[in-house]
Swiss-Prot record:
Protein name (record): Biosynthetic peptidoglycan transglycosylase
UniProt enzyme class: transferase
Localization (cell): Cell inner membrane
Pathway assigned to this chain's UniProt record: Cell wall biogenesis; peptidoglycan biosynthesis
Originating organism: Salmonella schwarzengrund (strain CVM19633)
Gene: mtgA
């Protein structure tokens, strides 16, 4: 009787290990490939597309027009760093002090959860993982973050991030966002336009760059102040990010 009970558990354990090994090979290959090849789509794009099809929205197309860092305004890279991860050039994927502050805040305010994900973490999860919150997903995110930080340069991480970030419903990547909201290529975005796009990133399905709320406008102004404090465009050159 005991052997019959153990056998299924052994089978499930082996199956789980094989699945994890296959995912490790898949993700490892993706990290290596996308270190040099433009990213055609992300896990978030795929999830949005499948969700739209299941809802009968067959006209929805999740798509991103890849552009190199040379074709992105330096203001845009600076804006997302100022808004999301000011220690981006310094850390190895994780901002430990920010994580500690977020944990302390979340213990005091359970209804208003604060995140502390770096641009590297956001790139890893947007590119490779499903949406949601769980310890399993966090563990995978940490491993993938270490992977891209090890293989990719900071400039590459920022380039991929800007090309797969969601700026609105069905609007992925800074080139699509620049064309949709400002009718210009990403290379010509001004400081204020870049800050406005960065201002919607916490929740691009709620906050609108084409109809900014008072909160979005105040966040845009804060981001612009942070951009100036970081040193403006020279910050990007100094840290070899453009």
């Amino acid at each position: 009787m005991s052997k019959r009970r153990i056998a299924p558990l052994t089978f499930l354990r082996r199956l789980l290990l094989r699945i994890l090994a296959a995912l490790a090979v898949f993700w490892g290959g993706g990290i290596a490939l996308f270190s040099v090849v433009p990213v055609p789509f992300s896990a978030v794009m795929a999830e949005r597309q499948i969700s739209a099809w299941l809802s009968g929205e067959f006209g929805y197309v999740a798509h991103s027009d890849w552009v190199s860092m040379a074709d992105i305004s330096p203001w845009m890279g600076l804006a997302v760093i100022a808004a999301e991860d000011q220690k981006f050039p310094e850390h190895w994927g994780f901002d430990v002090p920010a994580i500690e502050k977020a944990l302390a805040h979340n213990e005091r305010n359970e209804s208003r959860i604060r995140g502390a994900s770096t641009l590297s973490q956001q790139t890893a999860k947007n590119l490779f993982l499903w949406d949601g919150r769980s310890w399993v997903r966090k563990g995978l995110e940490a491993g993938l973050t270490l992977g891209i930080e090890t293989v990719w340069s900071k400039k590459r991480i920022l380039t991929v991030y800007l090309n797969i970030a969601e700026f609105g419903d069905g609007i992925f990547g800074v080139e699509a966002a620049a064309q949709r909201y400002f009718h210009k290529p990403a290379s010509r975005l001004s400081m204020s336009e870049a800050a406005l796009l960065a201002a919607v990133l916490p929740n691009p399905l709620r906050y609108k760059a084409n109809a900014p709320s008072g909160y979005v406008r105040s966040r845009q102004a804060w981001i612009m102040r942070q951009m100036r404090q970081l040193g403006g465009e020279s910050f990007m050159t100094r840290n070899q990010l453009n």
